[in-house]
Amino acid sequence: MNNMNKRTFLSLLLCVCCLSFLHAERVDMQQAGADVQGRKLNTALINSTIDRLNAHGGGTLFFPAGTYLTGSIHMKSNITLELEAGATLKFSENFDDFLPYVEVRHEGIMMKSFQPLIYAVDAENITIKGEGTLDGQGKAWWTEFFRVLVDLRDNG
C-alpha cells in the first residue's frame, strides 16, 4: 500500500470513529415519560432505556431538574447517567424494589443481598456525571438494619 492509500485509509477510519461517537444517542428522561415529581417509580423506564441504548452501542440518559423515584438501576457498557443541577435520583424506600437478590461482595465475602442502588456486572465505560443528587434514602435502610439487630439480640 503506498503512502497515499495509507493516508486515505487512515483518514476514512478516523472519520468513521468520530461519527460513531457523534451518533451516541442522548435521551432526555423527562421527555421519555419519566415522572419528575418523585411520586411514581421510574425503574422500568430507566432500565429499558439503558438496555435500548446499550443494544445500539451506548448513549446518555439525561435527567433534567426534577425528582426521579427509582429502584435498582442496572448499568450496561457505554452508558452515561447525566444529572442536571436540580435533578435527584431518589431511590425507593421499598426494599422489594431491590429484589431479586444478587451476588455482591461485602468486606471481601461473596453473598446474596439486595441489588445495589446502581448495579453493573461485566460492564465497562460507565459514567455518572453532573451536578444533580443521588439520594439513597439511607434512613429507611438504617432503620431496618437496627430493627434486625434488635430482633437478633432479643430472639437469637
Residue ranges of each PLM-predicted region?
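Bacterial Sec-dependent N-terminal signal peptides
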Residues: 1-27
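Extracellular/periplasmic carbohydrate-active domains that bind, remodel
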Residues: 17, 21-156
